[in-house]
Amino acid sequence: MFTIKQQLSLDTTHEVLVVGMFEKNQPLDGIIAECDRRLGGQVSVLLKEGDISAKKKQISKVHTLNQAGVKRLYFVGLGKEEELTFDLLREAFGKLFKTLKQAKRTEAAIALDTFVTKDIDANDAAHALSEAYYLATYEFPGYKQKKNEPEKRIESITIYTEADQAEIEASVFVGSVYGKATNSARTLVNTPSNLLTAADLANYAVELANKYEFEYEILEKDDMEKLGMGAFLAVNQGSKNPPKMIVLKYQGKETWENVIGLVGKGVTFDTGGYSLKPRESMVDMKTDMAGAAAVLGAMEIIGELRPEQNVVAVIPATDNMISGEAFKPDDVITSMSGKTIEVKNTDAEGRLILADAITYAKHHGASYLIDVATLTGGVIVALGVHTTGAMTNNEALFEQVLEASAETGEFIWRLPITEKDKERVRSSKIADLNNSPGREGHAIMGGAFLGEFAEDTPWVHLDIAGTSVTSKEHDLGPSGATGVMVRTLATLVERFE
């Protein structure tokens, strides 16, 4: 897919040559000046007339009309050099690859060094490029009858750079791994729930474990009953599909200590139970396992890159259905931790299955906990659809998660958990906890509830209800599942201190 070369010449035969262009007042230089000379000054003229733009994420195409071996020049606007960030560069590459895909180009050459600044070196640019390629060109395969005519797509990208070839190849590999794993998560989330049950999710995890030599454990219903996972089992009561508690373990150190626990909500479809969702809210509830997908995507990256860390991934997988056996408002259930819970809302089921998953992650030695869940509609009201809500009991761990999210462009914002919030989730008159104390501060109530099970273990909760799916196409992908938090979790593990 990617080939690294050093000597760039306009006489080289390519369908497309891609060049980065910054906004600046000085005369054209480097490869852009060479393009201008070959085309008899046309680049300068088109820049002056606005047909070529160096503004952020503007893509301009110029045909060379046989004045060079390269057929077409694509200029990628990058804005002011001092304002270019890794995230903006990744988006610019994403827009480029979408443009090339729409134009049905099958190969391209990229002058990588034209995308480099004093803050973004060639390795960063190579990572951004390869990651953006996979993210931007992703398509969910779907289930329509296939057309006989194969669709044209980019099959070859040649990267020209004067940087160390081995280092660039390594950066391209890492970016590709990040992009592919995010797409794996997207596909899981986009898959209809009749084709992705808890058993299917468990089978996927086992395949991942076998590929990357993870230790794994799949708890069946009988196992959960013996362990006292009453919160998880309550949610599954109404379903004909048995629950699965999925555990993957990666050991990158000699001893099993300082273990990072990744916990992902795996509700494969959520009707709301007897606290039934309205029709409009039930559509797309196949995506209620996006937290599980994020954790599995992160484990794919971990399996490929083999960081020197210890990681345990725990995923409670079930659907939340209605039947004569389903759990009900006013039920009292006992979690694996021994804490009792009064159910006031069967549509607040995610926190119930996560409660037992968090306890089980601690049972497997998790020293730090990060849970990821499409937990509440309240977080969408609070933060919208571009920012993930976060809550924590540990400043140092949160800062590491925050740094990882900033690096990957998956932005988070911290919400508080006060003593008053804790009192509200402990407000039941007949049980230790209340799973839904009220609508006020609903996102915080979900986090505060989970904090009761994290207890003193350093913990960060990530509510991705607003960010796991997008209704609009964007520079780094189509509408549908985003694969949010795959890259943040993997980056956190890689950089963890």
Curated annotation (Swiss-Prot):
Binds 2 manganese ions per subunit. Keywords: Aminopeptidase, Cytoplasm, Hydrolase, Manganese, Metal-binding, Protease. PROSITE patterns: CYTOSOL_AP. CDD domains: Peptidase_M17. Belongs to the peptidase M17 family. HAMAP family: Cytosol_peptidase_M17. This is Probable cytosol aminopeptidase. The lineage of its organism: Bacteria, Bacillati, Bacillota, Bacilli, Bacillales.
